[in-house]
Amino acid sequence: MNVIRTEIEDVLILEPRVFGDDRGFFYESFNQSAFEHILGYPVSFVQDNHSRSSKNVLRGLHFQRGEYAQDKLVRCTHGAVFDVAVDIRPNSVSFGKWVGVLLSADNKQQLWIPKGFAHGFLVLSDIAEFQYKTTNYYHPESDCGICWNDERIAIDWPQTSGLILSPKDERLFTLDELIRLKLIA
């Protein structure tokens, strides 16, 4: 597995070794031992999630607070998405910075997003299926998020018009509101 560093040290792009011929392809999408070797510490995933979304759907930017924070290993298994991780660790040198990556069924890349990051994605293809592993269970009372168009973060989305958001995602906080409300620490 090839590891590609991003502008934020702790966020990694993982690129599998793909074996292909006229029959199709094969690749190992996850190997616990290899993954922990890359990170340098043990990780225990407890939940796998799978979503299907239409073009222009924007999901996020989500995170869970406190003891329910989650590390995530994400990938797009059908179609393509623009995937984003935002550093919300107040003491981090990259606090408020973001990383954006094209994840697709074609490139088969995965993005490692550690605790302390908000995460979201924009569907670029007609349909996208998105799968991710988490190190903590979903906990509705700890669910939180940052609005996709927060001017302080200034994510350079591939498009900003015609987006489809859930009512919940339309009401998310700005980073400054999260700080003022003490929802990140």
Curated annotation (Swiss-Prot):
Residues the record marks as active site: 62 (proton acceptor), 132 (proton donor)
Q: Which reaction does it catalyse?
A: dTDP-4-dehydro-6-deoxy-alpha-D-glucose = dTDP-4-dehydro-beta-L-rhamnose
Q: Which GO terms describe its biological process?
A: DNA damage response; dTDP-rhamnose biosynthetic process; lipopolysaccharide biosynthetic process; O antigen biosynthetic process; polysaccharide biosynthetic process; response to antibiotic; response to UV
Q: Which Enzyme Commission numbers does its entry carry?
A: 5.1.3.13
Please verify whether the record's keywords include Isomerase: yes
Binding sites annotated in the UniProt record for substrate = 23, 28, 47-49, 59, 72, 119, 143, 168
Chain ranges passing through the membrane: none
What UniProt keywords apply to this chain's record, in alphabetical order? Answer: Carbohydrate metabolism, Isomerase, Lipopolysaccharide biosynthesis
Secretion signal, residue range per the UniProt entry: none
What is the similarity comment for this entry? Belongs to the dTDP-4-dehydrorhamnose 3,5-epimerase family.
Q: What does this protein do?
A: Catalyzes the epimerization of the C3' and C5'positions of dTDP-6-deoxy-D-xylo-4-hexulose, forming dTDP-6-deoxy-L-lyxo-4-hexulose.
Protein name according to UniProt: dTDP-4-dehydrorhamnose 3,5-epimerase
Q: Which organism is it from?
A: Escherichia coli (strain K12)
Originating gene: rfbC
